Amino acid sequence: MLFNIPKREPDDVNKIIEKVQETAEFKPVLKVKNGTVLNTLELIKANVEKNLGTYHCLLLDSNEAWLDYCRNVDKNTIVSLDTETSGLTFKDQVEGVAGVCIKSLNQTEAYAPIGHISTITDDYYPNQVSKEAIKQGFDILNKRGSKYIFHNAYYDLVVLKGLLGYFVPVYWDTMVASFLLNENEPHGLKYLYDKYVMKGKAGVHKFAELFDGIPFNYIPPNIGCKYSAHDSKMTEALYLFQKPFLTKGTSECTEYKLEGVCDVFYTEELPLIPVLADMYWRGIHVDLNKVNELIEKYTKLRDKAKKEFDMVISTLREEILFRAKNNGDIEYPVNYNSPAQIKVLIYEILKSGVIFKKEPTGTGKHVLDTVLNEAKYKG
C-alpha cells in the first residue's frame, strides 16, 4: 500500500458526524467592557435609530451603486468626503479602511462600505465596494472637476492615498477654516455643525462613544451607514456657512475685516495640508504631546504678559476710549495682537515721537522694549 491509512469503523464515522453537527458556542474575536459584542451592537443600533431614526442616507452596497453615484455628480461641484477606519494609527489608515462617505451638492449623502468585517465569521461582509471600484469612481469625479471638501483633510488624505495611490486636491477644510474664524472654541465637526448650522437645535450626538471596544470596521454597514454618511452632510453644511466669511468681497468678509484671514487660508493653510500629509506618509509626524506641552507653556506666558500689559495701559483708559469713539482705529482693552492698534497707542496716545528713524512708526520688539524701558536696543 502506498499510504497506510487506518480504516474507520461505522461507529467512529457517526461520532464524527454528530460532533460536526453540534452547535458550538460563539466566542467573538472582539472584547467589550460590558456585556457581549452582539449586545453592544444592538445597543449601538438602537442608539443610532433613536438619534437618526428618521434620517435618510444612501448605502452604496455594490460597485455599480458607487459608480452610479460618482457618474451623477454635477460637473465642477462641491463633493464632501470623509473616511472611516478601524482606528487612528497610520496602520489603521492604510490597512483598516472601513469605507468612504460622500455627498455632492446635487445628491443625498451616501456611504460606501469597503472593509467591514463580521464579528461572527471574522470575514468581510458581502455587498461592499471593491478598492478597484473606489479608484474608478474617483477617476470619474476627477474628470468631472469635483471640488473636494473635508473636515480634517490631513487625516483623510492619508486614507485616500492608501486607496488611490495619490493625494486628492483639497478645495476646502472646514476644521482649518474654523480655527481661523474662531480659535477659542472646540473644533469638532458635530459641535460646529450644531452651533453654526443648527443653532443649537441638533445637539451633539454622543452615540459614537458606544463604539468603544469595537472598531468601526466591525460595525455592520447598515448600522454604521447613518452615522458615517451624516458626517459628509455636516461638512457640506458647515462649508456653506463658512464660505461667505472667507470669500473676499462678500458682506460677511468685509464686515468682519477677514480679507487678511482669507489670504492666509488660501495661500498658506490649504496648500500646506497635502505637504503635511505627504510628510506623514513618509514617516514624519508631529509630536502632539510636545505640541500640547508647548501650548500650555506659552499660553501661560501670554496670559501673564497680557495681564501686565492691560495693567500698564489702564491709566490711559479715558484717552483710549476717546480715540476709539472719535477715530475708530483702536479699542479698549487694546488688542495687543494688532500692530495698527499698538502704533496708535505708541505714537498717537503716548505721543512718543519717532523712536527709530529707519522705522518711524515701527511696533517691533525693539520699539516696545525702548518704550517700556525694559531693554536697550542695539543696532
Sequence positions of predicted segments:
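Conserved "right-hand" nucleotidyltransferase catalytic core of DNA-directed polymerases
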Residues: 1-118, 184, 196-197, 203, ...
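Acidic beta-strand-to-loop metal/phosphate-binding motif
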Residues: 80, 145-153
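Short, glycine/acidic-enriched loop or turn micro-motifs at the edges of active sites
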Residues: 85-87, 154-155, 176
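Substrate-recognition/cap helix-loop segment adjacent to the acidic, metal-dependent catalytic center
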Residues: 89, 160-170
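Nucleic-acid-processing active sites and adjacent nucleic-acid-binding tracks
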Residues: 105-148, 284
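Switch/connector loops and helix/strand junctions flanking conserved nucleotide-binding motifs
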Residues: 121, 156-160, 187-189, 204
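Phosphate- and divalent-cation-binding pockets in alpha/beta enzyme and binding domains
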Residues: 155-162, 245, 345
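Conserved beta-strand -> loop -> alpha-helix junction used to position metal-binding or nucleic-acid-contacting
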Residues: 166-184, 189-190, 194
